[in-house]
């Protein structure tokens, strides 16, 4: 049942700012966890570390042996330096014929005539929808999402939200979208330079809890 175990993790920004320290948590099966911090770089650093793209400044992490991850990074620029169309682009990332690829794109609200578009001319929102389709194609049991609601319009957020609420695996994510966090997350972990605040509650309850506000005041 072990999904991810993190022990004493620390990340320091290039300018010497401590993004987080003394971070310890265990993710349990099925949990959908939102990560918060006053410094948005903290979440990106955590996600990059647990994906093996960045070295932690201290501490360790261990994934469970049956876990497969799909990562939606904050910066997706490098994925789109090509003149492939949407269907050909998506086909690189998993098995399936053209009809299947169009199905994945359709679920992220791409119309029939849009799938012939070249990916290097897409808007920020369209790129994010492509990245979500790519992630769904990977069929992982743990999704790691760094601010996935960036650039998305309301309709796209709603479509994505509905997919995630029904998702049976684990989700580790960050977001600026209040409603999105509230409907997806069942656990909240706030990353600070002095450790974590870790609660099994809704986002609304978390931000209105007076004890948590007091605790938070001493941690930054």
Regions found by a protein language model. Give the residues of each.
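ABC ATP-binding cassette signature C-motif
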Residues: 1-220
